[in-house]
């Protein structure tokens, strides 16, 4: 079954002539690495912002896009873009017929926290532990007690399973005081999802199909695999470092391209490493990272102060790029990178170019 998956694939026309012609050369700035990979911004603004609809709020992060499969009846559009509020109670949903927009918001969203098997109310905290949490100093808007007890679901990673005619979403939420884990949900239409109760592993899961297995990498670089994409994941190697944050995966032959960000960077930016996945997964190792994208424009946060990023929510307009997500066009071979801008203030799109 696993080889039938369309992993976050995007196909069809990418932008109208008018949209592309409106871009000045500076807006199409490409950042090139010594790995033969460059990233080119496709628009001079984000594709998702708070102005699109009041329902989505100010915190916008965690994109994942699918091309809606032909077997979905009466789709809202050709593409579904899932995203979240870092501390929100449902997975947001936008739709469009073109990756460059215009994007529209499906205000009810998709998966709701009440249907997720995660906590819907703050957990009880023992008085001594609560006192310790409250005594910790705030850090750029982060209150340790609030961070440890706020129910939410976030970080969707969405895939089309054509063989079983279902759409699969990995996501995470609060399962206890300071405890977050991931679960999975499925849908026949990409809007209404049914979650499964089994915790699968750590947060920020990103899935790929390889040699008959579903492999998952979660934060920070923890790998899992299972013959069943919905259950029974075994824990494998942990790569990268403890400060790794978000990641996106692209498999090409026996090479896994990992686009990722790191907590504490000034500014937080998107890196690229590769992993040779031809051998035993316990021997996998990542290459040294190279930078592929950093904030360069005000709408990406380049006008905000330079300061180290921190874990959890990005409050306000900050000088950070987060949440890389990869889309691959199976017909043209074009590869697209979505990412959160100015911390968690919107979602932008770029194209990834390979020398080969």
Label for each model-derived stretch:
Residues 1-3:
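N-terminal secretory signal peptides that target proteins for export/translocation
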Residues 21-29:
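Low-complexity, intrinsically disordered tandem-repeat tracts enriched in small residues
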Residues 28-317, 328-356:
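Beta-rich carbohydrate-recognition and catalytic domains
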Residues 321:
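Iron-sulfur (Fe-S) cluster-binding modules
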């Amino acid at each position: 079954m696993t080889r039938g998956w369309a992993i976050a694939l995007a196909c069809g026309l990418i932008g109208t002539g008018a949209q592309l012609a409106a871009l000045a050369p500076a807006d199409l700035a490409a950042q090139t690495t010594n790995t033969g990979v460059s990233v080119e911004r496709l628009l001079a603004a984000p594709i998702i912002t708070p102005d699109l609809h009041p329902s989505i709020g100010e915190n916008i992060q965690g994109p994942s896009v699918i091309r809606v499969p032909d077997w979905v009846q009466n789709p809202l559009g050709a593409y579904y873009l899932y995203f979240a509020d870092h501390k929100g109670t449902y997975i947001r949903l936008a739709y469009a017929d073109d990756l460059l927009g215009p994007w529209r918001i499906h205000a009810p969203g998709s998966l709701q926290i009440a249907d997720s098997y995660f906590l819907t109310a703050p957990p009880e905290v023992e008085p001594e532990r609560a006192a310790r949490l409250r005594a910790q100093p705030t850090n750029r808007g982060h209150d340790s007690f609030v961070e440890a007890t706020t129910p939410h679901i976030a970080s969707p990673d969405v895939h089309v399973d054509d063989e079983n005619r279902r759409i699969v979403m990995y996501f995470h939420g609060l399962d206890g005081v300071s405890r977050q884990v991931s679960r999975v949900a499925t849908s026949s239409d990409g809007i209404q999802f049914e979650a499964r109760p089994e915790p699968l592993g750590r947060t920020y899961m990103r899935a790929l199909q390889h040699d008959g297995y579903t492999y998952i990498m979660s934060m920070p670089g923890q790998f899992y695999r299972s013959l069943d994409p919905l259950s029974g994941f075994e824990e494998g190697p942990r790569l990268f470092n403890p400060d790794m944050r978000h990641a996106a995966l692209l498999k090409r032959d026996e090479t896994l391209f990992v686009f990722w960000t790191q907590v504490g960077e000034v500014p937080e930016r998107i890196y690229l490493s590769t992993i040779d996945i031809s051998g035993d997964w316990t021997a996998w190792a990542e290459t040294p990272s190279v930078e592929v994208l950093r904030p360069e424009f005000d709408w990406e946060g380049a006008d905000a102060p330079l300061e180290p990023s921190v874990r959890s929510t990005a409050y306000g307009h900050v000088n950070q790029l987060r949440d890389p997500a990869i889309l691959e066009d199976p017909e043209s071979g074009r590869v697209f990178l979505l990412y959160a801008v100015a911390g968690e203030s919107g979602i932008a799109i770029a194209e990834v170019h390979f020398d080969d």
